Amino acid sequence: MLAASPTTLPLFLALSACKGPAVLSGPPPVAPQTQMLLHAVTAELNLIWIYNKTMAEYSGLDSALAPLLAEHQAHLARLRARVIEPPGKKTPSAATARPAIAGTSAAALAQLRDAEQAAVTAQLGRLAGASPSLAQLYASIATSEATHVTALDGRIARS
């Protein structure tokens, strides 16, 4: 038991005013880097969705689009592997953007190309706030998506 003395009383009063962790106040906010990673997961889900819908609408494009879709599925797996699910926050599992597929196969390819270009820009925008290993992953995915833009441009030119 502490005895009240000139040195222990101020210490006791100071310590009793300290707050501990707010255990019951809910989960802590999600860190910005984790938010970026979750946005990257959602972006890949959106690209996968538009590829699947385009291939369902224009089956003649399957052979050209299937390899690009497979790369996006690999990107998604690599991104998800980096997610440590934060308390109170679920890892995205469904597309959030579901645009209508263009009315012709050439227009659908152009729509995919534009989506890929937007994805490149978004991935590059994530670099500044990312850890070195995440920045490397984002840059790798952006590079892959840039090659998709070129491949889709070539396919559009042949249409």
Regions found by a protein language model. Give the residues of each.
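All-alpha RGS (Regulator of G-protein Signaling) helical domain and cognate RGS-like helical scaffolds
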Residues: 2-159
